[in-house]
């Protein structure tokens, strides 16, 4: 059977398509996607990030009161995505990264196998309206966690800002490489501690009233669950010290986009964290990847589209038209 093409859709694309006028540009895109999905030519797996963002969107109207109609609208958008996802969903970032790492350690490279990146999961069909009323509360707590995740990158940005002058292109390239490299430190330190202790203690990050696992510890725990022993841990330390994340697609994408923001003096926001995780999860395996224009430009600056042979699209009119043409030819 011929391999299906993969289209990664972000929240903005879904919200623009779900009730678009059929003759509009977004309506045409929706129509061609539904056609190709039903013909089993195209697959549009749902990312976990879609669920995070759906739950996190405030259900309060302009007057500050609960808006049932707005809640229904968000639920309808989720239902539309569920219909085209056909029960397929992307794995989370740490799961994908752990799988890529183990393949690299055992086989010497990371092959783009679809089952490594997405699978059948119940949350693609979840009735979102039942739990949406408390979603905005989750989002507030999640923002505390996101602040922990990107505080180091924002610190790097401030250090570079204090260093003074605007970097030339060669200097930016060197700075990008450097910032990607230093993001390996926490993982190398964690692996060395794993080798010493023989186990992983998953620390919690306090996020308002809830406690969320530390991302480094969580990845190491998943690696141990996938039978990472001391020999493989030492091999991974050597890999990270020598090549950084270069051979691990999800981690390479994530660290590159984090570094790009720091080099260009941009402060990360909770939405940036979600968007970067979206790219880390879906960019490598997708044939077509939808992102906001800023992230599209960042992906292209880092040449990640070329490295992983993925076509990037944004909500700009000419970009949407180009995607419609591309999908029509499948």
Regions inferred by a protein language model and the residue ranges of each:
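Metal-dependent nucleic-acid phosphoesterase active-site entry motif
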Residues: 1-27, 167-199, 245-249, 253-254
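Extended charged low-complexity segments that act as oligomerization/scaffolding linkers
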Residues: 1-7, 28-115, 316, 322-330
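Conserved glycosyltransferase catalytic-site signature
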Residues: 11, 15, 48-52, 272-279
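A short secondary-structure junction motif
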Residues: 15-24, 49-68, 100-101, 178, ...
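Long, positively charged, glycine-interspersed low-complexity recognition regions
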Residues: 23-33, 40-41, 68-70, 75-78, ...
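Non-catalytic, alpha-helical, charged scaffold/linker segments
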Residues: 77-222
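Long, positively charged binding patches that form subdomain-scale interaction surfaces
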Residues: 192-277
């Amino acid at each position: 059977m011929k391999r299906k093409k993969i289209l990664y859709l972000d929240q903005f694309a879904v919200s623009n398509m779900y009730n678009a006028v059929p003759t509009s540009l977004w309506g045409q895109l929706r129509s061609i996607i539904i056609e190709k999905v039903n013909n089993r030519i195209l697959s549009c797996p749902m990312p976990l990030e879609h669920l995070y963002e759906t739950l996190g969107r405030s259900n309060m109207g302009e007057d500050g009161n609960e808006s049932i109609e707005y809640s229904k609208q968000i639920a309808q958008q989720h239902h539309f995505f569920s219909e085209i996802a056909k029960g397929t969903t992307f794995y989370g970032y740490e799961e994908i990264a752990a799988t890529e790492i183990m393949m690299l350690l055992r086989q010497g490279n990371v092959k783009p196998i679809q089952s490594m990146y997405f699978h059948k999961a119940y949350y693609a069909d979840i009735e979102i309206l039942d739990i949406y009323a408390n979603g905005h509360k989750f989002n507030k707590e999640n923002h505390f966690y996101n602040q922990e995740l990107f505080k180091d990158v924002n610190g790097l940005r401030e250090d570079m800002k204090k260093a003074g002058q605007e970097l030339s292109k060669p200097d930016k390239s060197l700075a990008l490489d450097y910032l990607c490299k230093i993001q390996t430190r926490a993982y190398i330190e964690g692996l060395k501690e794993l080798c010493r202790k023989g186990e992983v203690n998953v620390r919690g990050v306090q996020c308002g009233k809830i406690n969320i696992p530390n991302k480094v510890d969580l990845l190491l725990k998943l690696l141990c669950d996938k039978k990472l022993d001391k020999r493989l841990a030492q091999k991974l330390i050597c890999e990270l010290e020598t090549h950084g994340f270069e051979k691990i697609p999800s981690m390479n994408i994530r660290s590159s986009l984090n570094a790009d923001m720091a080099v260009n003096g941009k402060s990360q926001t909770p939405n940036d964290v979600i968007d970067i995780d979206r790219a880390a999860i879906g960019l490598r395996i997708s044939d077509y990847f939808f992102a906001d224009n800023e992230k599209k430009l960042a992906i292209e600056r880092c040449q990640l589209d070329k490295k992983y042979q993925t076509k990037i699209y944004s909500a700009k009119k000419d970009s949407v038209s180009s995607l419609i043409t591309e999908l029509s030819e499948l």
